[in-house]
């Protein structure tokens, strides 16, 4: 072994200065090591040297194994230490005393607050981490075991429902009526009285709970023990009866009613779009519109189109994007208003008009649409099993032209039994405009068919070949042929024979009872027949024959449907006026081969009423 290696083996660097004694001692140790090494080599011989090398390798391998085990043990101990720390934290957390909660009543300048907790009103201190200026009356706060406020929460979201009777003069208290008509005074939480809430609070409030002027009759969420009202709750019964939407229906979707559409646009859109002209001429806008006529002729469709068109026109006037036009169409489910409990129907009507006034106060047009108006507001005194109309009708009248005006609100009613509606509702000043939706004639029927038979529909190749592949010409010919067949005065189209009081007789055809709904049904039948034809023959496309067959099927299905007690009703339905009808006989020949049937004693109303 070289001297430098020996020096490194004994851990003495060459550049380290040594004293004379240390140098002598080191030199002596080197000589002894050399002697011992020579003795060892002479004792073991050549074979011993090889065995010694193997032992060294084994020892090195064992050292590596022990080092790896030691590393794993170190990692295990580290993980165990971390688990012990986590368990210690969990034990400390579980050992903490319980926290209490209370409702903040008021805050003071000396950093103390009044809190209602455990049925007591207490004055408590706040943790330095709490910013007292951000605390709001009625807010939930958390207390530690020393009854110190340590955390600010949100406003209470559960509790009892009470009805607001009135807001007191100070604006911070209210008289509410709870269960069993129990009256009490409660504080109003700041979301109910604040004009501007601080950052962080509006996020917890939806559109129905944002600050607005409270009105008598509002439902409030109340904590009777703390004496606070936290939130205004939307009335579920009104939500069930009212559908707020902007219908996706335009005037272009309606066929055959050009004159009626112009009338209702003049009655509804002009007053909203040109208010200054109405004021200049001292002209009062109409308060309501009645759409009446036979069923299936588009009364409800027109009402939806009015709401859509009015919203877009108002957006254009204001310079807003018409795609984001906003309007409210309150579609009232008429018969669901009726309730067996006395006064409930009237209350629902009040709530509906209250909702309409709230929406209209924003300057947005509101349309209140009563479908099947005759089911709710029938003539007073005509009730058989009840007299509910004697109070429901006056409630509607008081809402339309009572002390409270209806600004930006218009009422639209639809009915196919206008004779059953109370006359007081129909007088001028209430439902001013009355528009009759008549049955379509041949020209109107072509317009309606054009809404359903468009150029985008697949047409059979044979039919296209007749018009040299011109799809528009083929579609136009289809419409003309199907209208000619539907409105032809031929024997196959005869429906009823009516006898008048003077003895005269008249034949009524299916065209006298046609409607937009029937036309849509004919087209739907034809499309279904075209689909079946594709499945059977593999040849796609709609054919003229499909439409003609659908007309025959539609007429044949009506053979057993017409029935009425009063023959005069048929004259009203068909639009006939004049001589009284005393006898009716059906002339339908289709599915049944039996003789024609007289109608003068049957009791049920058919689909045409």
Curated annotation (Swiss-Prot):
<protein>
    <recommendedName>
        <fullName>Proteasome-associated ATPase</fullName>
    </recommendedName>
</protein>
<dbReference type="InterPro" id="IPR003959">
    <property type="entry name" value="ATPase_AAA_core"/>
</dbReference>
<dbReference type="InterPro" id="IPR027417">
    <property type="entry name" value="P-loop_NTPase"/>
</dbReference>
<dbReference type="GO" id="GO:0005524">
    <property type="term" value="F:ATP binding"/>
</dbReference>
<dbReference type="InterPro" id="IPR050168">
    <property type="entry name" value="AAA_ATPase_domain"/>
</dbReference>
<feature type="coiled-coil region">
    <location>
        <begin position="19"/>
        <end position="96"/>
    </location>
</feature>
<keyword id="KW-0067">ATP-binding</keyword>
<keyword id="KW-0143">Chaperone</keyword>
<comment type="pathway">
    <text>Protein degradation; proteasomal Pup-dependent pathway.</text>
</comment>
<keyword id="KW-0647">Proteasome</keyword>
<dbReference type="InterPro" id="IPR032501">
    <property type="entry name" value="Prot_ATP_ID_OB_2nd"/>
</dbReference>
<dbReference type="InterPro" id="IPR003593">
    <property type="entry name" value="AAA+_ATPase"/>
</dbReference>
<dbReference type="GO" id="GO:0016887">
    <property type="term" value="F:ATP hydrolysis activity"/>
</dbReference>
<dbReference type="GO" id="GO:0019941">
    <property type="term" value="P:modification-dependent protein catabolic process"/>
</dbReference>
<dbReference type="Pfam" id="PF00004">
    <property type="entry name" value="AAA"/>
</dbReference>
<dbReference type="Pfam" id="PF17758">
    <property type="entry name" value="Prot_ATP_ID_OB_N"/>
</dbReference>
<feature type="binding site">
    <location>
        <begin position="296"/>
        <end position="301"/>
    </location>
    <ligand>
        <name>ATP</name>
    </ligand>
</feature>
<keyword id="KW-0547">Nucleotide-binding</keyword>
<keyword id="KW-0175">Coiled coil</keyword>
<dbReference type="GO" id="GO:0010498">
    <property type="term" value="P:proteasomal protein catabolic process"/>
</dbReference>
<feature type="region of interest" description="Docks into pockets in the proteasome alpha-ring">
    <location>
        <begin position="608"/>
        <end position="609"/>
    </location>
</feature>
<dbReference type="InterPro" id="IPR003960">
    <property type="entry name" value="ATPase_AAA_CS"/>
</dbReference>
<comment type="subunit">
    <text>Homohexamer. Assembles into a hexameric ring structure that caps the 20S proteasome core. Strongly interacts with the prokaryotic ubiquitin-like protein Pup through a hydrophobic interface; the interacting region of ARC lies in its N-terminal coiled-coil domain. There is one Pup binding site per ARC hexamer ring. Upon ATP-binding, the C-terminus of ARC interacts with the alpha-rings of the proteasome core, possibly by binding to the intersubunit pockets.</text>
</comment>
<dbReference type="InterPro" id="IPR012340">
    <property type="entry name" value="NA-bd_OB-fold"/>
</dbReference>
<dbReference type="GO" id="GO:0000502">
    <property type="term" value="C:proteasome complex"/>
</dbReference>
<comment type="similarity">
    <text>Belongs to the AAA ATPase family.</text>
</comment>
<dbReference type="InterPro" id="IPR041626">
    <property type="entry name" value="Prot_ATP_ID_OB_N"/>
</dbReference>
<comment type="function">
    <text>ATPase which is responsible for recognizing, binding, unfolding and translocation of pupylated proteins into the bacterial 20S proteasome core particle. May be essential for opening the gate of the 20S proteasome via an interaction with its C-terminus, thereby allowing substrate entry and access to the site of proteolysis. Thus, the C-termini of the proteasomal ATPase may function like a 'key in a lock' to induce gate opening and therefore regulate proteolysis.</text>
</comment>
<dbReference type="Pfam" id="PF16450">
    <property type="entry name" value="Prot_ATP_ID_OB_C"/>
</dbReference>
<feature type="region of interest" description="Disordered">
    <location>
        <begin position="1"/>
        <end position="24"/>
    </location>
</feature>
<dbReference type="InterPro" id="IPR022482">
    <property type="entry name" value="Proteasome_ATPase"/>
</dbReference>
């Amino acid at each position: 072994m070289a001297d430098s290696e020996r020096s490194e083996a004994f851990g003495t660097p060459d550049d380290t200065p040594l004293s004379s004694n240390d140098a002598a001692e080191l030199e002596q140790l080197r000589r002894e090591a050399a002697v011992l090494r020579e003795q060892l080599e002479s004792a073991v011989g050549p074979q011993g040297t090889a065995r010694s090398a193997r032992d060294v390798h084994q020892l090195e391998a064992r050292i590596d194994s022990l080092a790896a085990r030691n590393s794993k043990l170190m990692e295990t101990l580290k993980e165990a230490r971390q688990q012990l720390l986590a368990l210690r934290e969990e034990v400390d957390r579980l050992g903490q005393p319980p926290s209490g909660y209370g409702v903040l009543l008021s805050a003071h300048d000396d950093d103390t607050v009044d809190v209602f907790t455990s049925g007591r009103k207490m004055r408590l201190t706040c943790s330095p981490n709490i910013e007292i200026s951000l605390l709001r009356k009625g807010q939930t706060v958390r207390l530690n075991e020393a009854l110190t406020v340590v955390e600010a929460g949100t406003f209470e979201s559960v509790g009892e429902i009470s009805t607001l009777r009135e807001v007191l003069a100070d604006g911070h208290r209210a008289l509410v009526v709870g269960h069993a008509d129990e009256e009490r005074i409660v504080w109003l939480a700041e979301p109910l009285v604040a004009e501007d809430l601080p950052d962080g609070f509006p996020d917890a409030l939806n559109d129905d709970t944002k600050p607005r002027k409270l009105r008598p009759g509002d439902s409030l969420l109340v904590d009777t023990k703390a004496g606070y009202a936290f939130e205004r709750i939307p009335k579920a019964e009104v939500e069930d009866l009212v559908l707020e939407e902007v219908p996706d229906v335009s005037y272009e979707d309606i066929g055959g009613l050009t004159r009626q559409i112009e009338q209702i646009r003049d009655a509804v859109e002009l007053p909203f779009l040109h208010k200054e002209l109405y004021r200049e001429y001292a002209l009062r806008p109409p308060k309501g519109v009645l759409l009446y006529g036979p069923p299936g002729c588009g009364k409800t469709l027109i009402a939806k189109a009015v709401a859509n068109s009015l919203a877009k026109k108002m957006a254009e006037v204001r310079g807003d994007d018409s795609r984001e036009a906003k309007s409210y169409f309150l579609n009232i489910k008429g018969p669901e208003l009726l309730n067996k409990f006395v006064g409930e129907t009237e209350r629902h009507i009040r709530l509906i008009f209250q909702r309409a006034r709230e929406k209209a106060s924003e300057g947005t047009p509101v349309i209140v649409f009563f479908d099947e108006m005759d089911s709710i507001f029938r003539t007073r005194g005509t009730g058989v099993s009840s007299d509910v109309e004697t109070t429901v009708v006056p409630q509607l009248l008081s809402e339309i032209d009572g002390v409270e005006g209806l600004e930006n609100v218009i009422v639209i009613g639809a009915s196919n039994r206008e004779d059953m509606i109370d006359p007081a509702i129909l007088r001028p000043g209430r439902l001013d405009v009355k528009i009759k939706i008549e049955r379509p004639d041949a020209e109107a029927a072509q317009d309606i068919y054009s809404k359903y038979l468009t150029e985008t529909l697949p047409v059979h190749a044979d039919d296209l070949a007749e018009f040299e592949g011109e799809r528009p010409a083929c579609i136009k010919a289809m419409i003309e042929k199907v209208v000619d067949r539907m409105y032809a005065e031929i024997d196959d189209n005869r429906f009823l024979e009516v006898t008048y009081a003077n003895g005269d007789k008249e034949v009524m055809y299916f065209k006298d009872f046609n409607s937009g709904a029937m036309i849509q049904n004919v087209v739907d039948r034809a499309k279904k027949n075209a689909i079946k034809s594709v499945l059977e023959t593999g040849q796609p496309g709609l054919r003229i024959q499909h439409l003609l067959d659908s007309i025959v099927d539609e007429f044949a299905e009506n053979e057993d449907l017409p029935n009425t007690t009063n023959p005069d009703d048929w004259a009203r339905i068909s639009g006939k006026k004049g001589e009284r009808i005393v006898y009716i006989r059906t002339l339908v020949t289709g599915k049944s081969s039996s003789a024609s049937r007289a109608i003068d004693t049957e009791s049920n109303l058919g689909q045409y009423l």
